[in-house]
Curated annotation (Swiss-Prot):
GO cellular component, one term: cytoplasm
GO biological process entries: diaminopimelate biosynthetic process; lysine biosynthetic process via diaminopimelate
Function comment: Catalyzes the condensation of (S)-aspartate-beta-semialdehyde [(S)-ASA] and pyruvate to 4-hydroxy-tetrahydrodipicolinate (HTPA).
Keyword rRNA-binding: no
EC class: lyase
Protein's name in the database: 4-hydroxy-tetrahydrodipicolinate synthase
Pathway as given in its UniProt record: Amino-acid biosynthesis; L-lysine biosynthesis via DAP pathway; (S)-tetrahydrodipicolinate from L-aspartate: step 3/4
EC number(s) recorded for this UniProt protein: 4.3.3.7
């Protein structure tokens, strides 16, 4: 269900110091992405500034996303928290709204032990909705080890992992240890998309696809159709963008990039702040090469 290129979408805010959502802008962005052939969308993730959204705003963003894509592509809704009860509340809401699955980041800051992680993810998966785990140690301070992921993959509702550890050996081991399950490993790093797919992964949850959806979809399609040379060529064509979108904390650069492309973005919510002039100039220069 969750394979291909799935943009982790931004949450546009109004120009009122980001106090309110721009849902019309969100839906316009989604129409653009779907028209470019993306295979799914991921609202309310890190790129969507989920940490600064209220519960009510989570509901509105997911509801607007589901309405906008109108069944054309699956919606994998961010529903994670370092509070298990809150993650359950987010997940139950996403399920009731009609999301196709939920993306659950590993609990951050409180650093649970192994048994706590198993109980946390299992309690969410027991709500009977497809769950994709999200491993991003650079943000959470904790790594989901391959053997832990393999154990979790045996839960019938845990269907995949967004792997953003940056460790290709770990990705390989996860794929190896989950081959006997209906379980998909998805890259959480645009620059690792092809290496992960070459090992048997299913695609990417992408930041860059907000900016260059056609090229990202083209790279995925070239690989799946056996045109390895074209896939590699597109990877290197996109590599400067991959780097530029992380010249500052995500989603600061990507919100600036889509704004420069004429898509809905709006301001960031504190504690995130706008890209400075020097980095904006560098990003603009990279974007100009894709015009």
């Amino acid at each position: 269900m969750f394979e291909g290129v799935l943009p982790a979408i931004v949450t546009p805010f109004q120009n009122d110091h980001a106090k309110s959502l721009d849902l019309l802008g969100l839906q316009s962005n989604l129409a653009f992405l779907v028209s470019k052939g993306v295979h799914g969308v991921v609202p309310c993730g890190s790129t969507g500034e989920s940490a600064t959204l209220s519960f009510e705003e989570h509901v509105k963003v997911i509801e607007a996303t589901i309405e906008a894509v109108a069944g054309k592509v699956p919606v994998l809704a961010g529903a994670g928290s370092n509070n298990t009860d809150e993650a359950i509340r987010f997940t139950r809401s996403a399920k009731d709204l009609g999301a196709d699955g939920v993306l659950i980041i590993s609990p951050y800051y409180n650093r649970p032990n192994r048994s706590g992680l198993i109980k946390h993810f299992s309690a969410i998966a027991d709500l009977d909705i497809p769950v994709v785990l999200y491993n991003v140690p650079s943000r959470t301070g904790q790594n989901l080890s391959p053997d832990l992921v393999a154990e979790l993959s045996r839960h019938p509702n845990i269907v995949g992992i967004k792997e953003a550890s940056g460790n290709i050996s770990q990705v390989s081991q996860i794929i190896e240890e989950t081959m006997d399950q209906d379980f998909t490993v998805i890259s959480g790093d645009d620059g690792m998309t092809l290496p992960v797919m070459a090992l048997g992964g299913g695609g990417v949850i992408s930041v860059a696809a907000n900016v260059e959806p056609e090229r990202m979809v083209g790279m995925y399609r070239a690989y799946t159709e056996g045109d390895w040379d074209d896939a590699i060529s597109l990877h290197y064509e996109l590599a400067p963008l991959f780097r530029a979108l992380f010249i500052d904390s995500n989603p600061i650069p990507v919100k600036k990039a889509i704004n420069l492309r004429g898509l809905a973005s709006g301001p960031l919510r504190l504690p995130l702040d706008e890209l400075d002039a020097e980095k904006t100039a560098a990003l603009t220069e990279v974007l100009s090469t894709y015009d």
